[in-house]
Amino acid sequence: FQQPADCPDFSSRLQEQQVCLERVTSSDLGLSGTIQVRNVAFEKQVSVRYTFNQWESLHEVCARWHQSIPAKNGQDQVDVFTFFLPVPPFLLQLSTLVQFAARYQVNGQEYWDNNRGKNYTLTCQTHPLKMPRECEESWIHFI
């Protein structure tokens, strides 16, 4: 999927849903990302619910507050939260799907960004590491 923050309707989706995934990146350890929420109240909880097996079982991680973005153009102040989803190494070799959605709880209400009902979905893949040509004949890789 395209990074949500790069979509032209990102601001309108945030206003409509109250919560919107901003960006996600992957590494060998898992997925990291940012979520924007409308600052409706001081007390709030942001989390990411995810699964590796088509929602037969699920996991949830709390996101942490990162920064506030001041109100502009008549839109409310926005808070940015960060999250990390650990991906077990054994799953990386199975081309497993990781599906997730962002959850925002505030003022007794619950709001979701689940990619318009499709969930955000990534496929775990491994990529062979290629040694730089200048290192191929170096002794350093034997140490």
Question: What spans do the regions from the language model cover?
Answer:
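Glycan-association/targeting regions that enable binding to alpha-glucans and other polysaccharides
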Residues: 1-143
